[in-house]
Every structure is written in C-alpha cells, then in structure tokens.
C-alpha cells in the first residue's frame, strides 16, 4: 500500500510539473543571467558578491514564502551563534592517544573571520546598516563538570593556545571566577562539584535573518535585480546551449512562468536536495537527505535575561552526537535580549519548517535508497538518540535545563520549535552510504547550476561557502586580475591563512570589530592551568554527528 501511495504521489507531482510547464510556455519567457532559488542567507550572500563582481549581470531571486529569511535563516529558527570554535567542544575531538585535535577548530575560526570581513565590507559600502541590529558581542564560554570533562577542557585550552586565532581565551576551575562570568550557571550549584570553564570576550550573537533582509533590500535597489515572492520552482530543464529553463508557479494566482537563466543557484535550505534531483544532473544521484528538527526553551523574563550575558556550551553526553551539545545562550532578536536553552532534537519528514510531510518520501529515489539504508543500519546509536529525544517529556527538558541553570523556574520558560536541518547522506564506495556533517556545494561539470546541501556550521560561514562556490563554478573569472582585486577588497585575508600570523590576526579582528561595533581588547597572556591528565581514548564506535 505504501508503494502504491508513493507511486501515485510521484505521478501527481510529475503531471503537475508537466502541466505547469505547458501553461508557462504560453506566457512570455523571462531571461536572467543568474537565478537564485531561495530567499535565505546563502542566496543573499551570493547575490551580494556577484553584484559587486559583475554589476551588469541581471539577477532574479524566487522565494516560495511571502517574505525572505523566514525559514532556517530566521533568527528564531537557529541558535544565532557566530560559530568560531571558541566554545564548541565538538570541533576539538580527542585523538586515540588522548591528545586534542584542533584542525577543525582552526578551519571553522578561519571561516568565520571571512564572514566578519565580508559583513564589515558591506557596512562600509552602506549595504548593511546599523551593525547592532544584526551582530552583538556576547562572550563565548565552554562549561563542563566531572573529572574527565575537566581534564578534557584543560587539554583543549592548552592545545588551542598553539593557534593565533584563539589568543585571549581565559580558563578557570574556580567557582567564584566562573560565577562572575556566568552567574546564572553557577548559582545554586554544589560548591564541591568539580567544574571548569573557558571564556572568550570576542564571541558574537548574530541575527542571520536581519543580515539576509538587509542584503536583499540592497540588491532590490538595482533595476537589474528582481525578487519574486510566493513563487515556487516546479521544474528545471537544461537547454541545448547549457542555459536552464526554470518553471516557477505563482502560489497566489496559480499562474506559471518560465525563467531562462545562464546560471542557477539552489539555495533553498532543506528543499535544495529535491530541486537538485529535479535538475537531472548526474552529480545529484550521490545524495540523499535526512531531516532533523530542533526545539529550544526560551525565557524572556527580565530576571533571567538580565542575569546572563554569554553563550555557554557544554559537552555532549556519552551516546549523543558531538554536535548535540546543550547550550544556554544570550540572544539579541529584533532588538530584544532573550535566553535560549537547547537544542532538543525533533523528527518530522518535512525538509522545511513550512514544508510538506511528503518531503522525505519524494526525495527518496532508486539511486539513494540504499545509501540511506546503510546509514540507518550503521548508526543505530544515532537512531536510538533521536528516538530518546523525541520521547522527552516537559519534565525531562526542564531537568536538562537545571544542569546548566540550577535555580531555573518552569514558569519562566516556554518551548519553541526552531527550523529543520536536512543532514547529508552521500553514497560511499566502501560503506554504501555515510552521514556527512557540514555543508557541500554540488555543481554540474559545466558550472551552470549549483546547490548547497547540508546544515552546519551553515549561516555563520555563508561568506566563505559562497567564495568556495565562486571558485568552483566561476573559476576562470576568479583567477582573473579583476576579480582577484575585488575579492581581496571584500575579504582582505582572501587567499591566505590568518592562523600562525599573530599580527594579521589582530589586524583583522581590530578592523572588523571597529566597523561592526564589537568589543575587542588586545589578548592578555594565557592563564596558567593544571597539567591535563588525559588517558588514551577508549576504543569504541563513535556516534555519527548531526546538526540541530
């Protein structure tokens, strides 16, 4: 019965797309150099790059909702962290010999520096306005308890001191000092409990929805940019000249139009996979998606909000994905401070918060069903974790909160459903299929269409991700003297690493902090810490990571 239902659904979708395409032929075809599918931060960032690099190119953006930045980019649908690995312990895994690996943390931090430079440049151009409306200084802290976790944090702190990107980080195991940094976390805690924390003053809270809205508003000021809302892509067809004909339905009046584009970017968040499959490019056959949602507890009580100014990340418990770390965060949303705690994983077959329950089924094909099955069979611990999260009661979530806020009161908190994150499943020659954390740009060989898949670190690295896309699909132009000069004006550190260069790191942090109105003091000498006593890591199968 399920197979019959799925087949009928696929036939209905296919017939609808054919019908739409036929109707669209009757209307005049619109032509554009660049078609941006999705009104989120990725499309907005790519459009902003291209507006500066090729101001004469025409651009069209289509968004199925009635406004831009209403899905994952919306400030309430994500954690709003400027991910720079200052506090996220999953970016510094423990090696088999007990040592700490910092390669991933360095890469994440380097990427966020590119985002800071990109945003600062847009502020200087007048594209982004009033930096405090979208980015604010909020210290980033790691907080752990228990002998093994304290040893881990000691070792992590020591390892990160090898990088110029993490200078200025503080470390303490003193209850009084940590209480000064994060009083809400320490008040009511057992004074004998062994705890440790790191703190970096230059952490940030970012409203990616506000950045998206401002970038798109600036693009709209140009006559060769068009924004079409309530417009859903129903079909993509490659033409003989390697352009694309994209059929777009107007969800308000039921009409359809064809847009002929030289380059198509699919930046549709969770919906990107299905649209990539619709394009028919062979590269799409390697991918499948698995949706995971997230919930947060939210407090707007001034007694709570005014008592906490930090993002405090913990360590994932045994058997949980490393990325699932609980955190209690100061957020600044629409000019108002709130505190969020979570995330708690949820499950829905929707690929978007405003998506369809058919999303998962309709994206499952003969080419990706086996990789999906392999991932499910190979990651039973992950399946078990997701089931346990879905089964959490209100009391369970409140008890989790009290581990980070011992004096929390139920009446101060409400539950909020954030966005959907579609995890990448990729075909693998050895394992059949693997779950991939991170984002991935998928494009055809001709560089005429590209999609962004994945969820983490996502919005905080939109600027470097779109730089990667430019290099992948516009390689010849990127290597030209003209584009090179402009890219280095947009991102001063473009083409080189900041890590290891103390002077360059401080120069870029000082520059971006000044333009973006962020706090930046010259780093002090590192804190002295007890020598970590890390043991070799036990041999055990690791839980696959996911983004929440």
From Swiss-Prot:
Enzyme class: oxidoreductase
GO biological process: tricarboxylic acid cycle
Keywords: FAD, Flavoprotein, Oxidoreductase, Tricarboxylic acid cycle
Biased composition (Basic and acidic residues): 539-548
Positions of the UniProt region annotated as Disordered: 522-548
Signal peptide (from-to): none
Catalytic activity: (S)-malate + a quinone = a quinol + oxaloacetate
Entry similarity comment: Belongs to the MQO family.
Lineage top rank: taxon: Bacteria
UniProt EC number: 1.1.5.4
Gene3D superfamilies: D-Amino Acid Oxidase, subunit A, domain 2 (3.30.9.10), FAD/NAD(P)-binding domain (3.50.50.60)
Pathway: Carbohydrate metabolism; tricarboxylic acid cycle; oxaloacetate from (S)-malate (quinone route): step 1/1
Protein name: Probable malate:quinone oxidoreductase
Names of the cofactor(s): FAD
Pfam families: Mqo
Single GO MF annotation: 2-hydroxyglutarate dehydrogenase activity
